[in-house]
Curated annotation (Swiss-Prot):
Subcellular location: Membrane
GO molecular function term, any single one: SNAP receptor activity
Cytoplasmic side: 1-391
Domain t-SNARE coiled-coil homology: 321-383
One Gene Ontology cellular component annotation held by this UniProt entry: presynapse
Spans annotated as Disordered: 257-290
Protein name per its UniProtKB record: Putative syntaxin-5
Stated family: Belongs to the syntaxin family.
Functional summary from the UniProt entry: Potentially involved in docking of synaptic vesicles at presynaptic active zones.
Keyword Transport: yes
Bilayer-crossing regions: 392-412
Membrane topology: Single-pass type IV membrane protein
GO BP, sorted A to Z: endoplasmic reticulum to Golgi vesicle-mediated transport; intracellular protein transport; synaptic vesicle docking; vesicle docking; vesicle fusion
Length: 413
């Protein structure tokens, strides 16, 4: 082991060459040694050389051992050529890369598909024995597609209802909504029917989600619950906006009625006799009538005046009745909307309470997880302390062995 062939030393030397080589005798039996070495000293020196050798030196020694074994197997005629080829190959492997990278390892393969199928079959039989009936995949996909389509349709109808609500709010915020009263009533009835239909559809979606959640307990059920809660909250916001729009419309109608009452009370004076401002015109008309009839007396047709006054009174009464009827219809619509909003908010409250229970369970689980993490941290700290103590013990044992080895080598050689 002390005679290595062409050992490449990485020690810097003052000469021009970067590496120093040691010649190796390929036939050590025929070499004449000038000095005899004791067997014990030779063994100790060999052991010291092995411990002091680097990884490259050990690799080169393994190369030489491989070359020597190859030489004994081949004939004497091609020994030099084969030796040079092997040495060049091994040197190229040792210099240009890891030799293991150039080795192609082929592992035996075996088809275990039948074993996998048998395992799956046994699992299905075990589940059937326990009373667990797995839901077919196509049924799960169809239910998921149905839920997504229903939720998508509800969301689209909600957006359309919001657009109608904005238009209704524009009509209701106008100061004089007498001309748009028919449009406001029409849009109010449409929005009310839309809110009622959306509430029913969301109820169906909630029942569908509860039915699906009973069959599975995973993240998909939680996602379904969140979708239902989101749609219900959007519908509640739409209902709240509808209620505010109806209140604005009612206030506008009340202001319009007050304004009409003010003007009607101001116009009640000319119903009987003409006012002083128009006295000259009336007097001129009477004079013209006198001149036409050729009479010096003044005659007033009291029957015509009473008929005109009764007609005006009937018209005002009819308009008042129409306004009262419209207002009663509006109030009935508002009351119905408020009752429907109460139902919607009650459903939303139930959903929020369910989510609150889920959040409470999540909070408790988080607390348990934090407690487990603290316990795991304490265990890891304890394990680290044990490892550090064992490491120090290993260092002490290794130091004692090294001291014993050095003393043994120095004093016994």
């Amino acid at each position: 082991m002390s005679d290595f062939h062409n050992i490449r030393s990485r020690r810097r030397i003052p000469e021009a060459s970067s590496y120093s080589t040691v010649d190796f005798d390929y036939d050590p039996d025929q070499k004449n040694h000038t000095s005899a070495v004791a067997p014990t000293s030779f063994a100790y020196s060999s052991l010291t050389t092995v411990f002091n050798a680097s990884a490259s030196q050990l690799w080169n020694s393994a190369q030489e051992a491989l070359v020597s074994s190859y030489d004994t197997a081949e004939g004497t005629e091609s020994i030099d050529a084969d030796r040079s080829k092997v040495v060049e190959t091994l040197e190229s492997l040792s210099i240009f890369g890891n030799p293991l990278d150039h080795i192609i390892i082929t592992m035996p393969s075996r088809d275990r598909t039948s074993e996998f199928r048998a395992t799956a079959k046994s699992y299905e039989m075990k589940a059937a024995a326990n009373g667990i009936r797995p839901q077919p995949k196509h049924e799960m996909l169809s239910e998921s597609v149905q839920f997504n389509q229903l939720a998508k349709r509800i969301g689209k109808e909600l957006s359309q209802t919001c657009a109608k609500m904005e238009k209704l709010a524009e009509y209701a915020k106008k100061k004089s909504c007498y001309e748009e009263r028919s449009q406001i009533d029409h849009l109010s009835s449409i929005v009310k029917s839309d809110i009622t239909g959306l509430n029913k559809q969301i109820g169906q979606l909630q029942e569908f989600s509860k039915r699906r959640a009973g069959n599975m307990k995973n993240q998909n059920s939680g996602h379904i619950q969140l979708v239902v809660v989101g749609l219900q909250s959007k519908l509640a916001n739409v209902g709240k906006d509808y209620q505010s729009v109806l209140e604005i419309s009612t206030e506008t109608m009340k202001a319009e009625k007050n304004r009409r009452d003010k003007f009607s009370s101001g116009a009640a004076v000319p119903m009987g006799l003409p006012s002083s401002s128009s006295g000259a015109n009336v007097r001129s008309k009477l004079l013209q009538d006198d001149e036409q009839h050729g009479s010096s007396s003044i005659a007033l047709d009291m029957g015509a005046l009473s008929n005109m006054q009764s007609q005006q009174t009937m018209q005002q009464r009819d308009s008042s009745l129409e306004y009262a009827q419209a207002r009663s219809n509006t109030m009935a619509t508002i009351e119905g909307s408020i009752s429907e909003l109460g139902q919607i908010f009650s459903q939303l409250a139930s959903l929020v309470s369910e989510q609150g229970e889920m959040i409470t369970r999540i909070d408790s689980n988080v607390e348990d997880t934090a407690l487990n993490i603290d316990m795991a941290h304490s265990e890891l700290v304890r394990y680290l302390q044990n490892i550090s103590k064992n490491r120090w013990l290993m260092i002490q044992v290794f130091g004692v062995l090294m001291v014993f080895f050095v003393v043994f080598v120095l004093f016994l050689t």
